[in-house]
Amino acid sequence: MVAMALLLCGCDLGPDEGATGEEIYLQLCAGCHDEDLGGGVGPDLGPGSNAAREDDEYLEFTITNGRGSMPSFTSLDEFQLERLIAYVREVQGE
């Protein structure tokens, strides 16, 4: 089961060009970080998490290059990255 989740998380098929940050998150991130950013296979990204204390450049670098067992998501363009990070920040601020 965990192997399948990791496999699916690593499938960088890329969201549609005009996808919202939430859509990008649900397609590429929620499989490991859960729909509410609470963590699972991957670490918690929600309010009060280590990720919430990092700056946007760190998140962009981590998403683009991967980290540890997290795959890289090189197919995201700068606008998709901005929307994804803005969505994560919005949820972290709730």
Question: What residue spans do the PLM features occupy?
Answer:
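Bacterial N-terminal signal peptides
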Residues: 1-9
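Solvent-exposed, well-ordered amphipathic alpha-helical segments
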Residues: 9, 22, 53, 89-92
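Bacterial signal peptide processing site
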Residues: 11-14
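Gly/Gly-Pro-rich "capping" loops immediately C-terminal to redox-active cysteine motifs
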Residues: 18-22, 26, 38-62
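Axial heme c-ligation environment in periplasmic c-type cytochrome domains
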Residues: 40-48, 62-94
